[in-house]
Amino acid sequence: MGQRLSCGCFRTDQLVTHSGEVVSLNADTFEEFSMEEFDIPPPPPLPKPVFKQPGPYKIPARSQRCPSKRRDPY
């Protein structure tokens, strides 16, 4: 799906900027650095998760009818 055309037009070791400048990505392009130069503090430790024990199982209570609204069957 277009791969035949894209292989000849795209190189993985070059970039083209908005101004049209071609930047080659090779070992000479990059500077050597060390992560120790950045002086980044270590991340704070993650808090320990708190697990709550489930309570005892309770049987749901039936809804109580209001006795004053009950009709007398007789």
From Swiss-Prot:
Residues covered by region (Asp/Glu-rich (acidic)): 34-40
InterPro entries xref list: Tegument_UL11_Herpesvir
Residue interval(s) of motif Di-leucine-like internalization motif: 15-16
Gene Ontology BP, a term: anatomical structure morphogenesis
Localization: Virion tegument; Virion membrane; Host cell membrane; Host Golgi apparatus membrane
Region (Disordered): 36-74
Lipid bilayer topology: Lipid-anchor
Record's keyword terms, sorted: Host cell membrane, Host Golgi apparatus, Host membrane, Lipoprotein, Membrane, Myristate, Palmitate, Phosphoprotein, Virion, Virion tegument
Organism, as annotated: Equine herpesvirus 1 (strain Ab4p) (EHV-1)
Binding partners and assembly: Interacts with cytoplasmic envelopment protein 2; this interaction is essential for the proper localization of each protein to the assembly complex and thus for the production of infectious virus.
Principal location class: virion
Phosphoprotein as UniProt keyword: yes
Stated family: Belongs to the herpesviridae cytoplasmic envelopment protein 3 family.
Annotated Gene Ontology cellular component terms: host cell Golgi membrane; host cell plasma membrane; membrane; viral tegument; virion membrane
PTM field: Myristoylation and palmitoylation (probably on one or more of the nearby cysteines at the N-terminus) enable membrane-binding and Golgi apparatus-specific targeting and are essential for efficient packaging. Phosphorylated. Phosphorylation does not seem to be required for recycling to the host Golgi apparatus. Packaging is selective for underphosphorylated forms.
Name used for this protein in its record: Cytoplasmic envelopment protein 3
